[in-house]
Amino acid sequence: MQIEELVPFWAKLTKEEQEELKNRILVQNVKKGTIIHNGSEDCTGLIIVEEGQLRAYTLSEDGKEITLYRMFQRDACLFAASCIMNNIQFEVIIEAREDSKVLTIPTSVYQNLIHTSLPVANFTNDLMASRFSDVMWVMEQILNKSVDVRLAALLSLIHISEP
């Protein structure tokens, strides 16, 4: 796939911004199990999945992994660039759930685009709201529903999705 097809705001960038993005974007093939972003230890940038699957999770105080959301083809992960956003104060780890190909817009490039391009700023706000909604749904499930109710819901989803 071409960069133009994967970057959601590509058509709304100026020619100069598009050229800088083409020159600075990183393309990586990552193996299953690879940690792509390790919380506050990294400030990776905006990650876009070209192929494969990623998982965003956090660790509880007792070391349990809590999956916040998954990312599939053409999904983007903003929390790997959370260091450029004020008031984002939680640890998110991004792991490849299968062999994957990802694009990364480096933090410095993405931060510049947020400040100079209204479409990129709007995309960022929309993505942040969407991911916040995902995280809140997970928290609601964990805090307000028993394990047996969550397991029953998961099993019914699996049953419905089978051919």
In which residue ranges do the predicted regions lie?
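Polybasic "coupling" helices that flank or enter modular domains
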Residues: 115-161
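Cyclic nucleotide-binding regulatory module and flanking cytosolic helices
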Residues: 1-32, 81-85
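Short alpha-helix-to-loop micro-motif enriched in aromatics/charged/Gly
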Residues: 61-68
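Short loop/turn microsegments at loop-to-beta-strand junctions
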Residues: 25, 43-44
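Glycine- and acidic-residue-biased ligand/ion/polar-headgroup-sensing regions
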Residues: 33, 44, 48-57, 73-74
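Short phosphate-coordinating micro-motif centered on Lys-Gly-acidic
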Residues: 36-41
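Cyclic-nucleotide recognition modules
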Residues: 68-126
